[in-house]
Amino acid sequence: MEAHLADMESSGGPTSSLAGTSRNTHVEDDDVVFIESVQPPICAPAIPNERNFVFASSKHENPPGTDSTISPSWRDLTSQKGNLCETIVIDDEGDTDTNGGEEKNPTDFIEWGPNGNKSSTKNVDFPIASLSRSKTKTAVGPFNPGRIDVTDAFQNGRFAVHHNPDSWISQSASFPRNQKQQGVDSLSPVASLPKQIFQPSNQQPTKPVKVTCANCKKPLQKGQTAYQRKGSAHLFCSTTCLSSFSHKRTRKTRNVMCKKDSPVRTTTIVPPVESSKSLQGFYNASLSPYENCQSLRKEVFTKSRCIICNKLGEVRHEISVNSITHKLCSNNCFNEYRLTNGLIMNCCEQCSKYMPKSTGHSILITGQQKRFCCQNCADEYKEIMEAKSKLLLLQNRKRNAIREENEKRLRESSGTLSGNTGDIPEKKEKSSEIIKVAADCSLDTSSEEQNVNLPCSVAVISDTFKEQLGDKNSEELDMSILPSLDPGSWPRILNMKQREFLVKNNPPQIRNFNFPKDSAGKKFSETYYTRILPNGEKGTRPWLLYSASKDSVFCLYCRLFGEGKNQLRNENGCKDWHHLSHLLSKHDESEMHINNSVKYSKLKSDLENKTNEATEGGEDCVQLLYT
Protein backbone atom coordinates (compact mmCIF):
# COMPACT_ATOMS: atom_id res chain seq x y z
CA MET A 1 0.00 0.00 0.00
CA GLU A 2 2.97 2.37 0.62
CA ALA A 3 4.29 1.66 -2.84
CA HIS A 4 0.93 2.44 -4.30
CA LEU A 5 0.84 5.75 -2.48
CA ALA A 6 4.39 6.52 -3.65
CA ASP A 7 3.26 6.06 -7.23
CA MET A 8 0.53 8.51 -6.57
CA GLU A 9 3.01 11.06 -5.26
CA SER A 10 5.33 10.69 -8.29
CA SER A 11 2.55 10.80 -10.86
CA GLY A 12 3.48 14.37 -11.84
CA GLY A 13 3.87 17.83 -10.35
CA PRO A 14 1.89 19.40 -7.58
CA THR A 15 -1.52 17.88 -7.68
CA SER A 16 -4.70 18.28 -5.76
CA SER A 17 -6.26 14.93 -4.95
CA LEU A 18 -9.86 14.17 -4.04
CA ALA A 19 -10.36 11.06 -1.97
CA GLY A 20 -13.98 9.79 -1.91
CA THR A 21 -15.71 6.54 -1.43
CA SER A 22 -17.84 5.34 -4.31
CA ARG A 23 -20.84 3.54 -2.94
CA ASN A 24 -24.52 3.07 -3.41
CA THR A 25 -26.09 3.83 -0.07
CA HIS A 26 -29.42 5.22 0.97
CA VAL A 27 -27.93 7.43 3.70
CA GLU A 28 -25.46 10.31 3.19
CA ASP A 29 -24.30 13.04 5.52
CA ASP A 30 -23.81 16.64 4.54
CA ASP A 31 -22.13 17.91 7.71
CA VAL A 32 -19.04 19.74 6.29
CA VAL A 33 -15.91 21.11 7.97
CA PHE A 34 -13.65 23.55 6.11
CA ILE A 35 -10.07 23.36 7.28
CA GLU A 36 -7.23 25.62 6.10
CA SER A 37 -3.55 25.31 6.65
CA VAL A 38 -1.69 27.55 9.07
CA GLN A 39 1.93 28.48 9.31
CA PRO A 40 4.05 25.90 11.13
CA PRO A 41 6.62 26.83 13.73
CA ILE A 42 9.88 28.43 12.70
CA CYS A 43 11.81 25.17 12.91
CA ALA A 44 9.51 23.53 10.39
CA PRO A 45 9.61 24.18 6.63
CA ALA A 46 7.12 26.70 5.41
CA ILE A 47 4.15 25.50 3.43
CA PRO A 48 3.43 27.87 0.59
CA ASN A 49 0.17 26.26 -0.36
CA GLU A 50 -3.03 27.17 1.34
CA ARG A 51 -5.32 24.20 1.35
CA ASN A 52 -8.95 23.86 2.19
CA PHE A 53 -10.00 20.39 3.19
CA VAL A 54 -13.64 19.41 3.05
CA PHE A 55 -14.59 16.38 5.14
CA ALA A 56 -17.95 14.69 4.87
CA SER A 57 -18.60 13.74 8.44
CA SER A 58 -19.73 10.29 9.24
CA LYS A 59 -21.60 8.84 12.09
CA HIS A 60 -18.46 7.31 13.61
CA GLU A 61 -16.44 10.45 14.18
CA ASN A 62 -14.95 11.41 17.47
CA PRO A 63 -17.30 13.19 19.88
CA PRO A 64 -17.34 16.98 19.91
CA GLY A 65 -14.63 18.65 21.84
CA THR A 66 -11.81 16.15 21.03
CA ASP A 67 -8.87 17.57 19.09
CA SER A 68 -6.70 15.57 16.71
CA THR A 69 -3.93 16.65 14.33
CA ILE A 70 -3.96 15.99 10.58
CA SER A 71 -0.49 15.90 8.94
CA PRO A 72 -0.28 15.48 5.16
CA SER A 73 2.28 12.98 3.73
CA TRP A 74 2.94 14.54 0.33
CA ARG A 75 6.59 15.52 -0.03
CA ASP A 76 6.23 17.93 -2.86
CA LEU A 77 4.11 20.46 -1.03
CA THR A 78 7.14 22.73 -0.47
CA SER A 79 8.07 22.76 -4.14
CA GLN A 80 4.68 24.01 -5.24
CA LYS A 81 4.48 27.57 -6.48
CA GLY A 82 1.53 29.75 -6.03
CA ASN A 83 -1.52 29.06 -3.95
CA LEU A 84 -3.50 26.02 -4.95
CA CYS A 85 -6.79 24.98 -3.39
CA GLU A 86 -7.30 21.35 -2.67
CA THR A 87 -10.60 19.81 -1.63
CA ILE A 88 -10.65 16.45 0.11
CA VAL A 89 -13.96 14.65 0.61
CA ILE A 90 -13.92 11.85 3.14
CA ASP A 91 -16.97 9.62 3.71
CA ASP A 92 -17.07 6.32 5.55
CA GLU A 93 -20.55 5.24 4.46
CA GLY A 94 -19.37 3.08 1.62
CA ASP A 95 -21.15 -0.08 0.53
CA THR A 96 -19.46 -3.31 1.48
CA ASP A 97 -18.88 -6.00 -1.06
CA THR A 98 -18.92 -9.50 0.25
CA ASN A 99 -16.42 -11.84 -1.38
CA GLY A 100 -16.00 -15.17 0.24
CA GLY A 101 -17.14 -13.97 3.62
CA GLU A 102 -14.74 -10.96 3.53
CA GLU A 103 -15.98 -7.40 3.35
CA LYS A 104 -14.14 -4.75 1.27
CA ASN A 105 -14.51 -1.04 0.82
CA PRO A 106 -13.62 0.07 -2.72
CA THR A 107 -12.09 3.53 -2.55
CA ASP A 108 -11.34 5.70 -5.58
CA PHE A 109 -8.63 8.36 -5.58
CA ILE A 110 -9.14 11.03 -8.20
CA GLU A 111 -6.22 13.36 -8.81
CA TRP A 112 -6.27 16.68 -10.58
CA GLY A 113 -3.15 18.33 -11.86
CA PRO A 114 -2.62 21.82 -13.07
CA ASN A 115 -4.61 23.25 -15.96
CA GLY A 116 -4.18 21.13 -19.01
CA ASN A 117 -3.42 17.88 -17.20
CA LYS A 118 -5.78 14.96 -17.54
CA SER A 119 -7.34 13.42 -14.51
CA SER A 120 -6.49 9.85 -13.73
CA THR A 121 -8.45 7.50 -11.55
CA LYS A 122 -7.01 4.70 -9.48
CA ASN A 123 -9.00 2.22 -7.55
CA VAL A 124 -7.55 1.10 -4.30
CA ASP A 125 -9.25 -1.62 -2.26
CA PHE A 126 -8.72 -1.76 1.45
CA PRO A 127 -9.75 -4.95 3.18
CA ILE A 128 -11.62 -4.15 6.36
CA ALA A 129 -12.69 -7.61 7.44
CA SER A 130 -10.33 -7.53 10.39
CA LEU A 131 -11.42 -4.13 11.57
CA SER A 132 -13.77 -3.84 14.53
CA ARG A 133 -15.61 -0.82 13.29
CA SER A 134 -19.38 -1.14 13.63
CA LYS A 135 -21.88 0.40 11.23
CA THR A 136 -25.34 1.43 12.28
CA LYS A 137 -28.07 1.90 9.69
CA THR A 138 -30.72 3.37 11.92
CA ALA A 139 -29.11 6.63 13.06
CA VAL A 140 -26.46 9.18 12.15
CA GLY A 141 -23.77 9.96 14.70
CA PRO A 142 -22.95 13.45 15.92
CA PHE A 143 -20.82 15.79 13.88
CA ASN A 144 -17.27 16.42 15.12
CA PRO A 145 -16.30 20.08 14.84
CA GLY A 146 -12.77 19.44 16.22
CA ARG A 147 -9.59 18.44 14.51
CA ILE A 148 -9.35 15.10 12.73
CA ASP A 149 -6.36 12.77 12.56
CA VAL A 150 -5.96 11.14 9.16
CA THR A 151 -4.18 8.16 10.70
CA ASP A 152 -7.31 7.52 12.81
CA ALA A 153 -9.33 7.62 9.63
CA PHE A 154 -7.09 4.98 8.06
CA GLN A 155 -7.34 2.81 11.13
CA ASN A 156 -11.10 3.09 10.77
CA GLY A 157 -10.89 1.59 7.29
CA ARG A 158 -10.55 4.55 4.87
CA PHE A 159 -7.01 5.53 3.76
CA ALA A 160 -3.53 6.03 5.20
CA VAL A 161 -1.09 8.88 4.87
CA HIS A 162 2.39 9.24 6.29
CA HIS A 163 2.44 11.48 9.32
CA ASN A 164 4.49 14.60 8.75
CA PRO A 165 5.23 16.50 11.97
CA ASP A 166 6.19 19.61 10.00
CA SER A 167 2.62 20.26 8.86
CA TRP A 168 0.08 21.96 11.03
CA ILE A 169 -3.58 21.98 10.15
CA SER A 170 -6.16 23.68 12.25
CA GLN A 171 -9.87 24.08 12.00
CA SER A 172 -10.98 27.23 10.27
CA ALA A 173 -14.78 27.07 10.30
CA SER A 174 -17.67 24.65 10.71
CA PHE A 175 -21.04 24.70 9.00
CA PRO A 176 -24.24 22.93 9.95
CA ARG A 177 -26.09 20.45 7.82
CA ASN A 178 -27.68 21.32 4.48
CA GLN A 179 -25.75 24.63 4.24
CA LYS A 180 -23.53 25.74 1.35
CA GLN A 181 -20.40 27.90 1.56
CA GLN A 182 -19.90 30.63 -0.97
CA GLY A 183 -17.39 29.68 -3.67
CA VAL A 184 -17.26 26.01 -2.72
CA ASP A 185 -19.44 23.30 -4.21
CA SER A 186 -21.25 21.36 -1.54
CA LEU A 187 -22.12 17.73 -1.60
CA SER A 188 -25.32 16.32 -2.99
CA PRO A 189 -28.36 16.62 -0.70
CA VAL A 190 -28.71 13.91 1.83
CA ALA A 191 -31.65 11.56 1.58
CA SER A 192 -33.92 11.46 4.53
CA LEU A 193 -33.38 8.58 6.87
CA PRO A 194 -36.16 6.04 7.21
CA LYS A 195 -37.92 6.34 10.52
CA GLN A 196 -37.99 3.21 12.56
CA ILE A 197 -41.37 2.39 13.99
CA PHE A 198 -41.33 0.70 17.35
CA GLN A 199 -44.30 -1.45 18.18
CA PRO A 200 -44.85 -3.30 21.41
CA SER A 201 -44.26 -6.99 20.98
CA ASN A 202 -46.79 -8.15 23.50
CA GLN A 203 -49.99 -6.22 24.01
CA GLN A 204 -51.69 -6.61 27.34
CA PRO A 205 -55.05 -8.40 27.05
CA THR A 206 -58.03 -6.25 27.89
CA LYS A 207 -59.57 -7.07 31.24
CA PRO A 208 -63.35 -7.49 31.49
CA VAL A 209 -65.06 -4.43 32.92
CA LYS A 210 -66.82 -4.97 36.23
CA VAL A 211 -70.07 -3.10 36.78
CA THR A 212 -70.69 -2.26 40.42
CA CYS A 213 -73.48 -0.62 42.36
CA ALA A 214 -72.89 3.10 42.83
CA ASN A 215 -74.04 2.99 46.46
CA CYS A 216 -72.90 -0.30 48.04
CA LYS A 217 -70.11 -1.01 45.48
CA LYS A 218 -71.24 -4.61 45.04
CA PRO A 219 -70.53 -6.14 41.61
CA LEU A 220 -73.58 -6.71 39.45
CA GLN A 221 -73.92 -10.23 38.12
CA LYS A 222 -74.83 -11.20 34.60
CA GLY A 223 -78.59 -11.22 34.15
CA GLN A 224 -79.24 -9.22 37.31
CA THR A 225 -81.82 -6.45 37.27
CA ALA A 226 -80.14 -3.04 37.52
CA TYR A 227 -81.90 0.17 38.50
CA GLN A 228 -81.04 3.54 37.02
CA ARG A 229 -82.43 6.98 37.64
CA LYS A 230 -83.43 8.90 34.56
CA GLY A 231 -80.74 11.34 33.49
CA SER A 232 -78.05 9.69 35.64
CA ALA A 233 -75.23 7.32 34.66
CA HIS A 234 -75.16 5.45 37.98
CA LEU A 235 -76.40 1.88 38.26
CA PHE A 236 -77.83 0.35 41.43
CA CYS A 237 -78.50 -3.20 42.57
CA SER A 238 -81.77 -2.43 44.37
CA THR A 239 -84.28 0.30 45.03
CA THR A 240 -82.86 0.80 48.51
CA CYS A 241 -79.46 1.76 47.11
CA LEU A 242 -81.11 3.94 44.48
CA SER A 243 -83.11 5.93 47.02
CA SER A 244 -80.29 6.26 49.56
CA PHE A 245 -77.52 7.19 47.11
CA SER A 246 -78.15 10.84 46.37
CA HIS A 247 -80.84 13.32 45.64
CA LYS A 248 -81.99 14.13 42.16
CA ARG A 249 -79.88 16.79 40.52
CA THR A 250 -81.41 20.14 39.81
CA ARG A 251 -82.96 20.64 36.43
CA LYS A 252 -81.08 22.89 34.04
CA THR A 253 -83.31 25.57 32.58
CA ARG A 254 -82.70 28.41 30.20
CA ASN A 255 -82.72 31.88 31.69
CA VAL A 256 -85.71 33.71 30.27
CA MET A 257 -84.79 37.13 31.61
CA CYS A 258 -81.31 38.56 31.29
CA LYS A 259 -79.77 39.76 34.50
CA LYS A 260 -78.54 42.97 32.87
CA ASP A 261 -81.96 43.89 31.50
CA SER A 262 -83.85 43.04 34.67
CA PRO A 263 -84.54 45.97 36.98
CA VAL A 264 -82.41 45.64 40.06
CA ARG A 265 -84.32 46.94 43.03
CA THR A 266 -82.46 46.48 46.23
CA THR A 267 -83.41 47.63 49.65
CA THR A 268 -80.68 49.45 51.48
CA ILE A 269 -80.25 48.23 55.02
CA VAL A 270 -78.07 50.18 57.41
CA PRO A 271 -77.03 47.97 60.30
CA PRO A 272 -76.81 49.64 63.71
CA VAL A 273 -73.46 50.07 65.35
CA GLU A 274 -74.32 47.75 68.20
CA SER A 275 -75.55 45.00 65.87
CA SER A 276 -73.94 41.59 66.32
CA LYS A 277 -75.18 40.17 63.01
CA SER A 278 -72.73 39.22 60.30
CA LEU A 279 -72.39 41.06 57.03
CA GLN A 280 -73.66 37.98 55.17
CA GLY A 281 -77.04 38.37 56.83
CA PHE A 282 -77.37 41.93 55.62
CA TYR A 283 -76.23 40.91 52.15
CA ASN A 284 -78.88 38.18 51.94
CA ALA A 285 -81.52 40.68 53.02
CA SER A 286 -80.76 42.90 50.00
CA LEU A 287 -81.15 40.36 47.21
CA SER A 288 -82.56 41.52 43.91
CA PRO A 289 -86.00 40.33 42.71
CA TYR A 290 -84.30 38.41 39.89
CA GLU A 291 -82.21 36.33 42.30
CA ASN A 292 -85.25 35.67 44.48
CA CYS A 293 -87.16 34.48 41.42
CA GLN A 294 -84.32 32.15 40.44
CA SER A 295 -84.18 30.60 43.91
CA LEU A 296 -87.93 29.96 43.83
CA ARG A 297 -87.65 28.31 40.42
CA LYS A 298 -85.00 25.91 41.67
CA GLU A 299 -87.21 24.86 44.57
CA VAL A 300 -90.19 24.26 42.26
CA PHE A 301 -88.23 22.20 39.74
CA THR A 302 -86.82 19.85 42.35
CA LYS A 303 -90.32 18.85 43.52
CA SER A 304 -92.97 16.83 41.76
CA ARG A 305 -96.30 15.20 42.58
CA CYS A 306 -96.42 11.53 43.53
CA ILE A 307 -98.80 9.35 41.53
CA ILE A 308 -99.80 7.27 44.59
CA CYS A 309 -100.18 9.67 47.52
CA ASN A 310 -100.64 12.78 45.33
CA LYS A 311 -98.21 14.73 47.52
CA LEU A 312 -95.88 17.40 46.19
CA GLY A 313 -92.35 16.53 47.23
CA GLU A 314 -89.02 15.11 46.15
CA VAL A 315 -89.14 12.25 43.65
CA ARG A 316 -87.29 9.14 44.83
CA HIS A 317 -88.45 6.65 42.17
CA GLU A 318 -89.34 6.95 38.51
CA ILE A 319 -91.02 4.15 36.54
CA SER A 320 -91.20 4.44 32.77
CA VAL A 321 -93.95 2.45 31.02
CA ASN A 322 -94.20 2.98 27.25
CA SER A 323 -92.55 6.42 27.35
CA ILE A 324 -94.81 7.47 30.25
CA THR A 325 -92.91 8.33 33.44
CA HIS A 326 -94.59 7.73 36.79
CA LYS A 327 -92.99 9.54 39.73
CA LEU A 328 -93.06 8.16 43.27
CA CYS A 329 -92.01 9.92 46.44
CA SER A 330 -91.06 7.03 48.78
CA ASN A 331 -90.42 3.32 49.04
CA ASN A 332 -93.91 2.71 50.40
CA CYS A 333 -95.48 4.31 47.35
CA PHE A 334 -93.16 2.30 45.13
CA ASN A 335 -94.14 -0.98 46.82
CA GLU A 336 -97.82 -0.10 46.53
CA TYR A 337 -97.42 0.70 42.84
CA ARG A 338 -95.50 -2.52 42.30
CA LEU A 339 -98.12 -4.65 44.04
CA THR A 340 -100.95 -2.93 42.21
CA ASN A 341 -99.52 -3.48 38.74
CA GLY A 342 -98.08 -6.90 39.46
CA LEU A 343 -94.44 -5.92 39.05
CA ILE A 344 -92.15 -8.71 40.20
CA MET A 345 -88.60 -7.96 41.35
CA ASN A 346 -85.98 -10.67 41.65
CA CYS A 347 -84.70 -9.48 45.00
CA CYS A 348 -85.19 -10.12 48.69
CA GLU A 349 -87.96 -8.12 50.36
CA GLN A 350 -85.75 -7.39 53.39
CA CYS A 351 -82.15 -6.87 52.20
CA SER A 352 -82.88 -6.25 48.48
CA LYS A 353 -80.29 -8.82 47.46
CA TYR A 354 -80.55 -10.19 43.94
CA MET A 355 -82.06 -13.67 43.68
CA PRO A 356 -82.72 -15.82 40.62
CA LYS A 357 -86.25 -17.03 40.12
CA SER A 358 -85.53 -20.60 41.21
CA THR A 359 -83.92 -19.63 44.55
CA GLY A 360 -85.15 -18.05 47.77
CA HIS A 361 -87.99 -18.70 50.20
CA SER A 362 -91.54 -17.74 49.26
CA ILE A 363 -93.73 -16.85 52.25
CA LEU A 364 -97.38 -15.75 52.26
CA ILE A 365 -97.80 -12.71 54.51
CA THR A 366 -101.17 -10.95 54.86
CA GLY A 367 -102.40 -12.49 51.63
CA GLN A 368 -99.33 -11.46 49.60
CA GLN A 369 -96.49 -13.61 48.35
CA LYS A 370 -93.10 -12.43 49.61
CA ARG A 371 -89.65 -13.70 48.62
CA PHE A 372 -86.63 -13.81 50.91
CA CYS A 373 -83.05 -14.88 50.35
CA CYS A 374 -82.73 -16.68 53.70
CA GLN A 375 -84.67 -17.46 56.85
CA ASN A 376 -83.01 -14.63 58.79
CA CYS A 377 -84.39 -12.03 56.39
CA ALA A 378 -87.83 -13.60 56.71
CA ASP A 379 -87.67 -13.42 60.52
CA GLU A 380 -86.54 -9.79 60.44
CA TYR A 381 -89.35 -8.91 58.06
CA LYS A 382 -91.86 -10.60 60.38
CA GLU A 383 -90.57 -8.60 63.35
CA ILE A 384 -90.89 -5.35 61.42
CA MET A 385 -94.44 -6.17 60.39
CA GLU A 386 -95.38 -7.09 63.95
CA ALA A 387 -93.96 -3.81 65.24
CA LYS A 388 -95.96 -1.88 62.64
CA SER A 389 -99.15 -3.74 63.53
CA LYS A 390 -98.62 -3.01 67.24
CA LEU A 391 -98.15 0.65 66.45
CA LEU A 392 -101.37 0.67 64.44
CA LEU A 393 -103.18 -1.02 67.31
CA LEU A 394 -102.02 1.64 69.75
CA GLN A 395 -103.13 4.37 67.40
CA ASN A 396 -106.55 2.73 67.04
CA ARG A 397 -106.94 2.52 70.80
CA LYS A 398 -106.09 6.20 71.12
CA ARG A 399 -108.66 7.14 68.50
CA ASN A 400 -111.29 4.95 70.18
CA ALA A 401 -110.64 6.63 73.53
CA ILE A 402 -111.08 10.07 72.01
CA ARG A 403 -114.27 8.97 70.30
CA GLU A 404 -115.67 7.56 73.54
CA GLU A 405 -115.05 10.84 75.33
CA ASN A 406 -116.87 12.76 72.61
CA GLU A 407 -119.82 10.39 72.71
CA LYS A 408 -119.97 10.61 76.49
CA ARG A 409 -120.22 14.36 76.33
CA LEU A 410 -122.91 14.05 73.67
CA ARG A 411 -124.93 11.68 75.83
CA GLU A 412 -124.75 14.02 78.80
CA SER A 413 -125.98 16.91 76.70
CA SER A 414 -128.76 14.76 75.17
CA GLY A 415 -129.83 13.56 78.65
CA THR A 416 -130.26 17.08 79.86
CA LEU A 417 -132.16 17.92 76.67
CA SER A 418 -134.57 14.96 77.09
CA GLY A 419 -135.19 15.89 80.74
CA ASN A 420 -136.09 19.43 79.80
CA THR A 421 -138.48 18.49 76.98
CA GLY A 422 -140.72 16.48 79.29
CA ASP A 423 -143.78 14.97 77.68
CA ILE A 424 -143.68 16.85 74.35
CA PRO A 425 -143.49 14.13 71.64
CA GLU A 426 -142.33 16.47 68.87
CA LYS A 427 -139.31 17.59 70.87
CA LYS A 428 -138.51 13.97 71.68
CA GLU A 429 -138.48 13.10 67.99
CA LYS A 430 -136.19 16.06 67.26
CA SER A 431 -133.82 15.03 70.03
CA SER A 432 -133.77 11.47 68.71
CA GLU A 433 -132.91 12.79 65.27
CA ILE A 434 -130.04 14.82 66.73
CA ILE A 435 -128.73 11.75 68.50
CA LYS A 436 -128.97 9.72 65.28
CA VAL A 437 -127.04 12.31 63.28
CA ALA A 438 -124.33 12.44 65.93
CA ALA A 439 -124.08 8.66 65.89
CA ASP A 440 -123.73 8.63 62.09
CA CYS A 441 -120.90 11.17 62.25
CA SER A 442 -118.83 8.88 64.45
CA LEU A 443 -116.26 6.68 62.70
CA ASP A 444 -117.54 3.29 63.80
CA THR A 445 -121.01 3.25 65.31
CA SER A 446 -121.71 -0.47 64.99
CA SER A 447 -118.83 -1.59 67.22
CA GLU A 448 -119.38 1.10 69.80
CA GLU A 449 -123.10 0.51 70.28
CA GLN A 450 -122.37 -2.95 71.63
CA ASN A 451 -119.85 -1.75 74.22
CA VAL A 452 -121.55 1.46 75.38
CA ASN A 453 -124.54 1.36 77.74
CA LEU A 454 -126.92 4.09 76.64
CA PRO A 455 -129.33 5.76 79.08
CA CYS A 456 -132.89 4.43 79.16
CA SER A 457 -134.45 7.51 77.62
CA VAL A 458 -131.97 7.67 74.74
CA ALA A 459 -132.29 3.93 74.06
CA VAL A 460 -136.08 4.10 73.91
CA ILE A 461 -136.01 7.07 71.53
CA SER A 462 -133.54 5.42 69.20
CA ASP A 463 -135.51 2.16 69.11
CA THR A 464 -138.74 3.89 68.21
CA PHE A 465 -136.97 5.89 65.50
CA LYS A 466 -135.56 2.73 63.97
CA GLU A 467 -138.90 0.94 63.99
CA GLN A 468 -140.64 3.79 62.19
CA LEU A 469 -138.06 4.42 59.46
CA GLY A 470 -136.50 0.97 59.17
CA ASP A 471 -138.46 -0.48 56.26
CA LYS A 472 -138.54 2.62 54.05
CA ASN A 473 -134.86 3.44 54.47
CA SER A 474 -133.76 -0.14 53.80
CA GLU A 475 -135.63 -0.24 50.49
CA GLU A 476 -134.27 3.16 49.40
CA LEU A 477 -130.71 2.18 50.36
CA ASP A 478 -130.96 -1.08 48.43
CA MET A 479 -132.14 0.73 45.32
CA SER A 480 -129.64 3.60 45.46
CA ILE A 481 -126.53 2.09 47.05
CA LEU A 482 -126.47 -1.54 45.99
CA PRO A 483 -126.13 -1.89 42.20
CA SER A 484 -126.12 -5.29 40.54
CA LEU A 485 -122.89 -7.07 39.70
CA ASP A 486 -123.61 -6.79 35.96
CA PRO A 487 -121.60 -3.79 34.66
CA GLY A 488 -124.13 -3.25 31.88
CA SER A 489 -126.81 -2.24 34.40
CA TRP A 490 -124.69 0.28 36.30
CA PRO A 491 -125.67 3.97 36.14
CA ARG A 492 -123.63 6.35 34.04
CA ILE A 493 -122.20 8.16 37.08
CA LEU A 494 -121.43 6.24 40.28
CA ASN A 495 -121.32 7.89 43.68
CA MET A 496 -118.80 7.10 46.41
CA LYS A 497 -120.99 4.58 48.26
CA GLN A 498 -121.65 2.62 45.07
CA ARG A 499 -117.94 2.53 44.31
CA GLU A 500 -117.14 1.24 47.78
CA PHE A 501 -119.81 -1.44 47.46
CA LEU A 502 -118.43 -2.64 44.11
CA VAL A 503 -114.85 -2.58 45.37
CA LYS A 504 -115.78 -4.64 48.44
CA ASN A 505 -117.81 -7.23 46.50
CA ASN A 506 -115.40 -7.40 43.51
CA PRO A 507 -117.71 -8.31 40.57
CA PRO A 508 -116.78 -11.76 39.19
CA GLN A 509 -115.78 -12.66 35.63
CA ILE A 510 -118.31 -14.74 33.72
CA ARG A 511 -116.93 -18.14 32.73
CA ASN A 512 -118.36 -21.36 31.27
CA PHE A 513 -120.94 -19.36 29.38
CA ASN A 514 -122.17 -19.76 25.82
CA PHE A 515 -121.20 -16.35 24.48
CA PRO A 516 -123.43 -15.27 21.55
CA LYS A 517 -122.01 -14.51 18.09
CA ASP A 518 -122.47 -11.27 16.21
CA SER A 519 -123.45 -10.84 12.56
CA ALA A 520 -119.87 -11.52 11.43
CA GLY A 521 -119.65 -14.75 13.42
CA LYS A 522 -117.31 -13.29 16.07
CA LYS A 523 -117.85 -13.67 19.81
CA PHE A 524 -116.21 -13.10 23.17
CA SER A 525 -113.90 -15.78 24.59
CA GLU A 526 -112.46 -16.55 28.01
CA THR A 527 -108.94 -16.32 26.57
CA TYR A 528 -109.24 -12.52 26.75
CA TYR A 529 -109.08 -12.78 30.55
CA THR A 530 -105.35 -13.62 30.23
CA ARG A 531 -102.48 -12.03 28.36
CA ILE A 532 -98.86 -12.84 27.46
CA LEU A 533 -96.28 -10.71 29.26
CA PRO A 534 -93.09 -9.50 27.50
CA ASN A 535 -91.02 -12.13 29.36
CA GLY A 536 -93.21 -14.95 28.02
CA GLU A 537 -95.24 -15.55 31.17
CA LYS A 538 -99.02 -15.47 31.37
CA GLY A 539 -100.76 -12.66 33.22
CA THR A 540 -104.38 -12.10 34.18
CA ARG A 541 -106.77 -9.25 33.48
CA PRO A 542 -108.88 -9.04 36.65
CA TRP A 543 -110.33 -5.74 35.50
CA LEU A 544 -112.04 -7.17 32.39
CA LEU A 545 -115.78 -7.82 32.95
CA TYR A 546 -118.34 -9.26 30.53
CA SER A 547 -121.95 -8.04 30.60
CA ALA A 548 -124.49 -10.65 29.57
CA SER A 549 -127.27 -8.07 29.33
CA LYS A 550 -125.47 -5.91 26.73
CA ASP A 551 -123.10 -8.54 25.26
CA SER A 552 -120.11 -6.24 25.75
CA VAL A 553 -117.00 -5.95 27.93
CA PHE A 554 -116.02 -3.26 30.44
CA CYS A 555 -112.91 -2.20 32.35
CA LEU A 556 -113.70 -2.26 36.08
CA TYR A 557 -111.05 0.33 37.00
CA CYS A 558 -111.97 2.81 34.27
CA ARG A 559 -115.71 2.26 34.81
CA LEU A 560 -115.44 3.24 38.47
CA PHE A 561 -112.84 6.04 38.30
CA GLY A 562 -112.33 6.81 34.62
CA GLU A 563 -113.35 9.79 32.56
CA GLY A 564 -113.74 10.17 28.83
CA LYS A 565 -115.40 8.40 25.92
CA ASN A 566 -113.36 5.22 25.89
CA GLN A 567 -115.33 2.15 24.80
CA LEU A 568 -114.23 0.18 27.84
CA ARG A 569 -115.26 3.01 30.15
CA ASN A 570 -118.67 4.23 28.95
CA GLU A 571 -122.03 2.70 29.83
CA ASN A 572 -122.36 0.74 26.56
CA GLY A 573 -119.03 -1.09 26.69
CA CYS A 574 -117.01 -2.55 23.81
CA LYS A 575 -118.26 -5.30 21.48
CA ASP A 576 -115.74 -5.05 18.63
CA TRP A 577 -114.71 -8.72 18.82
CA HIS A 578 -112.66 -8.52 15.62
CA HIS A 579 -110.23 -5.92 17.06
CA LEU A 580 -110.68 -6.70 20.75
CA SER A 581 -107.23 -8.25 21.19
CA HIS A 582 -105.50 -5.12 19.89
CA LEU A 583 -107.76 -2.82 21.93
CA LEU A 584 -107.10 -4.71 25.16
CA SER A 585 -103.31 -4.75 24.70
CA LYS A 586 -103.36 -1.02 23.99
CA HIS A 587 -105.62 -0.38 26.97
CA ASP A 588 -103.24 -2.29 29.27
CA GLU A 589 -100.48 0.22 28.56
CA SER A 590 -102.53 3.43 28.62
CA GLU A 591 -101.80 6.04 31.26
CA MET A 592 -105.47 6.47 32.16
CA HIS A 593 -105.87 2.76 32.90
CA ILE A 594 -102.74 2.68 35.09
CA ASN A 595 -103.86 5.69 37.11
CA ASN A 596 -107.32 4.22 37.61
CA SER A 597 -105.85 0.91 38.74
CA VAL A 598 -103.81 2.76 41.36
CA LYS A 599 -106.94 4.51 42.62
CA TYR A 600 -108.81 1.19 42.77
CA SER A 601 -106.06 -0.53 44.78
CA LYS A 602 -105.77 2.42 47.14
CA LEU A 603 -109.51 2.45 47.87
CA LYS A 604 -109.52 -1.30 48.36
CA SER A 605 -106.62 -1.17 50.81
CA ASP A 606 -108.33 1.63 52.77
CA LEU A 607 -111.52 -0.38 53.07
CA GLU A 608 -109.58 -3.45 54.19
CA ASN A 609 -107.77 -1.40 56.84
CA LYS A 610 -111.08 -0.13 58.18
CA THR A 611 -112.46 -3.64 58.49
CA ASN A 612 -109.25 -4.84 60.15
CA GLU A 613 -109.40 -2.00 62.66
CA ALA A 614 -112.99 -2.85 63.48
CA THR A 615 -112.22 -6.54 64.02
CA GLU A 616 -108.96 -5.98 65.88
CA GLY A 617 -110.33 -3.23 68.13
CA GLY A 618 -111.21 -5.58 70.99
CA GLU A 619 -108.16 -7.85 70.66
CA ASP A 620 -104.94 -7.38 72.60
CA CYS A 621 -102.71 -9.66 70.56
CA VAL A 622 -101.43 -9.28 67.03
CA GLN A 623 -102.15 -12.02 64.53
CA LEU A 624 -100.22 -12.43 61.28
CA LEU A 625 -100.73 -15.24 58.83
CA TYR A 626 -97.49 -16.99 57.82
CA THR A 627 -97.45 -20.12 55.72
Curated annotation (Swiss-Prot):
It is found in: Nucleus. There is a cross-link at K59, K137, K195, K408, K427, K517 (Glycyl lysine isopeptide (Lys-Gly) (interchain with G-Cter in SUMO2)). PANTHER family: ZINC FINGER MYM-TYPE PROTEIN (PTHR45736), ZINC FINGER MYM-TYPE PROTEIN 5 (PTHR45736:SF7). It comes from Mus musculus (Mouse). SMART domains: TRASH. One of its GO terms (molecular function) is zinc ion binding. This is Zinc finger MYM-type protein 5. One of its GO terms (cellular component) is nucleus.
